[in-house]
């Protein structure tokens, strides 16, 4: 891999424990650059980077910079941060995360995966197919790849696969050779202001492509389909389950072992087509079939053999916090999932419905008061595939409460919209007892959210087992369970 042309000295990452920042830091470290950082939380990403030999301070103060010559920040870091203030007082370059990612992308041919939902899984699937083809890509992802135990790794090949985060608009600056768009929904309106601005950003993302590149776009999503006619003078490949898709999924079957489907690949210019039959994907849900079709579209256009595509998908090991099984207790299976937008929640619960013949119990920790408030009606209707819903306190993520955006309001909204079984969770400690009371063997408990609920999901199987054990002892002693 080519290096940056000048000696840039030590790089200091403010908020290095974030999923996007940690990936960039890891790749730069593996390239031989001196990397250091700070974070408010001593989280799993911080521990992983420390194990690589990267020094990280907990807390933010000017002294953390040391002899740093460049400071890298995410959009979440404020100008009032003492490390940022000290960097600017010392006339050091202060670089946004996306700008640093863009500089890394210039060192290779790059594939950037964007979209409101599904981009982490799709990025992982693209990387998997390039790996299967022996292309050994560099990868910077927004989630931990189960096969690697990290969200980023440095490959020896000429390609880089990155997740393009649209949350602050900076993804429009990424110099991709190939772009993929999964879907476009109203999200991050606190930054964009209007949905039209979101649409404009995605158009700019595609228009940045060079003439020799191409975009792979999900035609099943109405917003993406509506954008295609506006993207003149760019090569576009579409994918989806629609008969209009260039990369079309057919004969889809979904079950407890994942998905099985065929893919019909059509060349619009030449008029020919071929079929890859019997693809098996060890993931649940129609939405993951779509994610796989996007990855297939890129792999096929890059000339990767059909047999390699089939084998690569079959051996895909998934991404942490994407329908991740954390354990079982008394026949009850606990699932951890990052889904926190109504579209994501609905897709995950539909996948859960396909994965079990028994009940699906959703435990949701709404993420941000602003999101719950602006999408309240959507939240009230996205749990239809859950037999029971448990609503926890809103994870504030630094926000102040908004009247009408609370767990009580959401629970009442679900009931008003026709949901038959809704529970308000008193606190985290009450979850094991509640689940023990309402769950039966064979049920799936799906924990949903982008906040601290992942910790709950990982602890729940053992906690549930303990509650079940106490209940059995009480029953044997002749008391009420």
UniProtKB/Swiss-Prot annotation:
Subcellular location per the Swiss-Prot or TrEMBL entry: Cytoplasm
Gene Ontology terms: cellular component: cytoplasm
Reactions that this protein is recorded to catalyse: UDP-N-acetyl-alpha-D-muramate + L-alanine + ATP = UDP-N-acetyl-alpha-D-muramoyl-L-alanine + ADP + phosphate + H(+)
InterPro entries the record matches: Mur-like_cat_sf (IPR036565), Mur_ligase_C (IPR004101), Mur_ligase_C_dom_sf (IPR036615), Mur_ligase_cen (IPR013221), Mur_ligase_N (IPR000713), MurCDEF_pg_biosynth (IPR050061), UDP-N-AcMur_Ala_ligase_MurC (IPR005758)
Binding, ATP: 115-121
Function according to Swiss-Prot or TrEMBL: Cell wall formation.
Protein's UniProt name: UDP-N-acetylmuramate--L-alanine ligase
Gene this protein is translated from: murC
């Amino acid at each position: 891999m080519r290096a940056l042309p000048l000696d840039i000295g030590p790089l200091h990452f403010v908020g290095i424990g974030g999923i996007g920042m940690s990936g960039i830091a890891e790749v730069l470290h593996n390239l031989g650059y001196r990397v250091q950082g700070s974070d408010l939380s001593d989280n799993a990403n911080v521990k992983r980077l420390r194990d690589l030999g990267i020094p990280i301070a907990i807390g933010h103060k000017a002294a953390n910079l040391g002899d740093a010559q460049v400071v890298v920040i995410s959009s979440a870091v404020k100008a009032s941060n003492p490390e940022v203030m000290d960097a600017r007082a010392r006339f050091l370059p202060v670089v946004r995360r996306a700008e640093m990612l863009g500089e890394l992308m210039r060192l290779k041919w790059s594939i950037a995966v964007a979209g409101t939902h599904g981009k982490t899984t799709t990025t992982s699937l693209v990387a998997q197919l390039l790996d299967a083809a022996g292309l050994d890509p560099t990868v910077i992802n927004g989630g931990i790849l189960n096969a690697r135990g990290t969200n980023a790794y440095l490959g020896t090949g000429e390609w880089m696969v990155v997740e393009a985060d649209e949350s602050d608009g900076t993804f429009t600056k990424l110099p991709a050779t190939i772009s993929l768009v999964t879907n476009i929904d109203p999200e991050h309106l606190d930054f964009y202001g209007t949905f039209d601005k979101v649409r404009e950003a995605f158009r700019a993302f595609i228009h940045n492509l060079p003439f020799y590149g191409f975009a792979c776009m999900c035609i099943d999503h109405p917003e993406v389909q509506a954008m295609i006619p506006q993207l003149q003078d760019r090569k576009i490949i579409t994918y989806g389950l629609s008969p209009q898709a260039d990369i079309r999924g057919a004969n889809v079957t979904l079950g407890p072992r994942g998905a099985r489907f065929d893919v019909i690949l059509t060349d619009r210019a030449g008029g020919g087509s071929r079929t890859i039959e019997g693809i098996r994907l060890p993931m649940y849900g129609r939405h993951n079939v779509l994610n796989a079709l996007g990855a297939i579209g890129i792999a096929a256009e890059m000339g990767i053999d059909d047999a390699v595509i089939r084998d690569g998908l079959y051996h895909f090991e998934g991404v942490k916090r994407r329908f991740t099984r954390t354990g079982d207790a008394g026949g009850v299976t606990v699932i951890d999932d990052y889904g926190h937008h109504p579209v994501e929640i609905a897709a995950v619960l539909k996948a859960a419905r396909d994965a079990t013949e028994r009940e699906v119990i959703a435990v949701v920790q709404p993420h941000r008061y602003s999101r719950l408030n602006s999408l309240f009606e959507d939240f009230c209707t996205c749990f239809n595939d859950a037999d029971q819903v448990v609503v926890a306190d809103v994870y504030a993520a630094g926000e102040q409460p908004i009247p009408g955006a609370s767990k009580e309001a959401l629970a009442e909204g679900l009931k008003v919209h026709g949901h038959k079984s809704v529970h308000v969770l008193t606190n985290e400690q009450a979850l094991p007892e509640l689940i023990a009371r309402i769950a039966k063997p064979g049920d799936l408990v799906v924990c949903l959210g982008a906040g601290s609920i992942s910790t709950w999901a990982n602890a729940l199987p053992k906690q549930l087992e303990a509650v079940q054990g106490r209940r059995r002892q009480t029953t044997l002693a002749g008391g009420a369970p």
